[in-house]
Structures are given as C-alpha cells and as structure tokens.
Amino acid sequence: MSVEDWDWSLRLFDHVDLHASDYRESVRFYETVLAPLGVPKLLERGDWTCFANLNVADRRPATQNLHLCFYARAKEEVDEFHRAGTAAGFRSNGPPGYRDYGLGYYAAYLLDPDGNNVEALYRDVGNVGHGVGPRLR
C-alpha cells in the first residue's frame, strides 16, 4: 500500500494522554490553539483536562519530544491556529505554508510549554500545482 492508497479518514487512535510539567500553562496553550480548529475543551477534572481526543494531565515526568498533528478543515484554520498561538505568547516552530511532505501539505507549527511540536495540517488537494510532491523517508 502507498501513501496515495491509504484511507486518511480512518481513525488510528481513540485518545492521547499528554503529561504536562506546567499543567495550567499547557491547558491554556491547547485551549488557545485548538479553538481555531474546532476542538473544544470538553471536560476538566482537577488535574486532568479533555480536549476531544487529547487529554492533558498534571503528571510527571512531562511528555517531551512529541510531534502532534491536528487536522484542519481549511488553510484559514491553520493560519488562525498559528496566529492565536503566537499572539498568546507561544513559540512558533514554523509559520503557515506549503511543505514538501506531500501534495497540498499546508501546515504550521507551534511549541507547547514542554517543547512538544504541535502542528495544524490542511491537506489542500485542490491546490497541488505549487510543485511540491510526496516526500518519503
């Protein structure tokens, strides 16, 4: 099976737990950057917060060196994800734009308070004429 043949609508994970060294700041980060993607804060219980499929918990050791990629429904959501995060004082790890990771791969990156690389991705299949092709490693 190839990248082109994969059914990208399939769910691979039910949820992900992220342990935070600064729980409140991590909740603020994810609340800020997930809102433009339509991902709500569903539940908060003391030292644990649920953002749809992502749980943020006040646990040690903190999760680090992780790359999380969230689906965006439009380029504008990717742009707003990055704008909201940087406006709130969080660090950019790459501005919105097309990447050479695949056709129509439009993404932006932010670093959460523990240094995890958090990405918003829109697969712009209607705009593949920008010369970027699949990149496989």
What is each residue range found by the language model?
Residues 1-27, 68, 124-137:
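N-terminal beta-strand motif that seeds the catalytic metal site of vicinal oxygen chelate
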Residues 3-7, 52-88:
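Long, continuous compositionally biased terminal/linker segments
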Residues 47, 98, 121-123:
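Residue-level structural signal for beta-strand termini and adjacent loop
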Residues 17-55:
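Core segments of cupin and vicinal oxygen chelate
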Residues 103, 109, 120-127:
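Short beta->alpha transition motifs characteristic of CBS
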